[in-house]
From Swiss-Prot:
Induction: Up-regulated upon H(2)O(2) or salt treatments. It comes from the Eukaryota. This is Protein NCA1. GO terms for cellular component: cytosol; nucleus. The RING-type zinc finger domain (1-158) is involved in the increase of catalase activity and zinc ion binding is required for this increase. The interaction with CAT2 is through the C-terminal TPR-containing domain (159-405). InterPro entries: TPR-like_helical_dom_sf, Znf_RING, Znf_RING/FYVE/PHD, Znf_RING_CS. Residues 1-85 are annotated as: Disordered. Residues 76-85 have a biased composition (Polar residues).
Length: 405
C-alpha cells in the first residue's frame, strides 16, 4: 500500500529528495498546492477554456490568435493520414502540437518556465532566460551563431506585470498614497492551455526552472510564494493548511540554496520549514514525511560540514518523527521503509563516532523491519526500494562482524 498525496503541500515540496546522502529516501511528485491537476497532463485540459476579458495580456495569450492549433511555420506541412512509418513528425519548439502542453508567450523554451532575466540573442533576436541561454554558443531555436546577448528589459517588465497581476495570491493597487489590497485568492491563473490555482502556478514555474537547473528563477518564484503565504498567515492566523504550505515552500527554497552551494541559507530555510511543520498535528503521513525529510536534509548538511554530533541529533529527530508516524499508521509500508532509512542514517553516524554497539543495533533493527515487511505484488517500486535498503543494511552488519573478528 502506498500513501497518496492528501496534504496541500505533499511530496512535491522536495524536487531533489532523491539527492540525499543515503539511497532509498524517495518522494513522489505532486504540486504543493495539489488542488490543481498536473499542468502538463494532456488529460487535464478543459475544452473551451478561455482567458478572462479585460486583461491587458489577453490578446497575447495565444500566439496563434486566429485559431490555428499548430505552429505557423509547420502548418500544412504534416499529412496526418500519412502511413509512412519512417516519417517522424516535426515538433514545434513552443509546444503547438497535440502531444505536448503549450508554452505561453512569456515562457522560456529551454526551461519551460516563465522568463527570468529575459535575454535576447543577437542577431536572431530569440529570447530565453539568461541562465538558460548562457549555456549555448548557437541559438537553441534557429541555430544561428550568438554574437552577443542583450538584456530585454521591456519583455521582462511584461512578465513581471503578468505575475503581479495574475499569478500572485494577492495584488496591491496604488490608490493615492495608500495601498488597497485586492483579494484574488479564489481566482485562477489562465495561461497557455491550463487553468490553475494562483499558488500552484508559481510553484509549477519554480519546479520547472529547478529541473532545468535555473535555480535563480526557481528561488525568485518560491520567494514570491513565501511572501504571499506569510501575508495570508497574517490575515488568517496559523491554519494547518497555510503552515503546511509555507513549510513545504521553505523546504523547496532550502533545496534551491543547497543546489547553489549556499549551505547556510539552506539550513536556515530547512529549519524554518521544520518550525512551521511542527505547529501541525503529526497524524498526517504527508506532513510527517515532509517534516522528517527537512530534518534529514539539515542532518546531511551538518554531516558535510563535519559536525557529526549535530548531524546525529537531526537524524535522530527525523527517526523519532517517523517512529511516531509508524505507530499511527502501522499498515503503511512506505512509513516502515522510511523508519528503516532513518535507522541506517543514525547507525552510520554512530559508527563514525565509534559507537559500534549502537550502530550494529540500529542496522539490525532496520533489517528486522524490512525482512518482516510483506508487500503486495503491485507495489513493485516499494519492493525495489525495500531490497535496496535491506542490501545496504546487511552489508553494514557484515562489515561490523568482520571488524569484530
Amino acid at each position: 500500500m502506498t500513501t497518496t498525496s492528501v496534504c496541500p503541500f505533499s511530496k512535491a515540496a522536495r524536487p531533489d529528495d532523491g539527492s540525499t546522502r543515503k539511497q532509498g529516501e524517495i518522494t513522489a511528485s505532486g504540486c504543493p498546492f495539489s488542488k490543481a491537476a498536473r499542468p502538463d497532463d494532456a488529460s487535464a485540459r478543459k475544452q473551451g477554456e478561455t482567458t478572462a476579458s479585460g486583461c491587458p495580456f489577453s490578446k497575447s495569450a495565444r500566439p496563434d490568435e486566429n485559431g490555428s492549433k499548430g505552429c505557423p511555420e509547420q502548418e500544412g506541412n504534416l499529412n496526418k493520414d500519412s502511413t509512412d512509418s519512417a516519417t517522424v513528425p516535426a515538433k514545434c519548439p513552443f509546444g503547438y502540437d497535440s502531444q505536448t502542453f503549450k508554452l505561453g508567450p512569456f515562457s522560456c523554451m529551454l526551461c519551460q518556465a516563465l522568463l527570468y532575466e529575459s535575454s535576447r540573442c543577437v542577431p536572431c533576436t530569440h529570447v530565453f532566460c539568461k541562465v538558460c541561454l548562457t549555456r549555448f554558443k548557437d541559438c537553441p531555436l534557429c541555430g544561428a551563431d550568438i554574437e552577443s546577448i542583450e538584456v530585454d528589459e521591456n519583455l521582462q517588465k511584461m512578465v513581471d506585470q503578468f505575475i503581479e497581476g495574475h499569478a500572485r495570491i494577492k495584488r496591491s493597487v496604488v490608490n493615492g498614497t495608500e495601498k488597497e489590497e485586492v483579494e484574488n485568492d479564489n481566482k485562477k491563473v489562465i495561461y497557455a492551455d491550463v487553468s490553475m490555482e494562483r499558488g500552484s502556478f508559481l510553484v509549477q514555474q519554480a519546479m520547472r526552472a529547478f529541473s532545468a537547473q535555473n535555480y535563480e528563477s526557481a528561488k525568485s518564484r518560491l520567494a514570491m510564494c513565501t511572501e504571499d503565504i506569510r501575508d495570508q498567515l497574517g490575515r488568517e492566523g496559523n491554519t494547518p493548511e497555510l503552515c503546511s504550505q509555507l513549510g513545504a515552500v521553505l523546504g523547496m527554497l532550502g533545496d534551491c540554496s543547497r543546489a547553489m552551494g549556499d549551505s547556510s541559507s539552506a539550513v536556515k530555510h530547512f529549519e524554518e520549514s521544520v518550525e512551521f511543520l511542527m505547529k501541525l498535528p503529526l497524524n498526517d503521513l504527508e506532513i510527517t514525511h515532509t517534516l522528517s525529510v527537512s530534518l534529514n536534509k539539515i542532518g546531511d548538511l551538518k554531516y558535510y560540514d563535519e559536525d557529526l554530533q549535530a548531524a546525529r541529533s537531526y537524524y535522530d529527530r527525523a527517526l523519532n518523527v517517523r517512529r511516531d508516524a509508524m505507530k499511527h499508521h502501522p499498515n503503511a509500508p512506505s512509513q516502515i521503509l522510511d523508519v528503516a532509512v532513518s535507522l541506517a542514517k543514525v547507525a552510520d553516524i554512530d559508527r563514525t563516532l565509534q559507537n559500534e554497539v549502537a550502530a550494529t543495533d540500529g542496522f539490525k533493527e532496520g533489517m528486522r523491519l524490512l525482512e518482516s515487511l510483506k508487500l503486495d505484488s503491485e507495489d513493485s517500486a516499494l519492493e525495489q526500494r525495500r531490497l535496496s535498503v535491506l542490501e545496504f543494511l546487511k552489508k553494514q552488519v557484515e562489515t561490523d562482524a568482520e571488524t569484530a573478528l
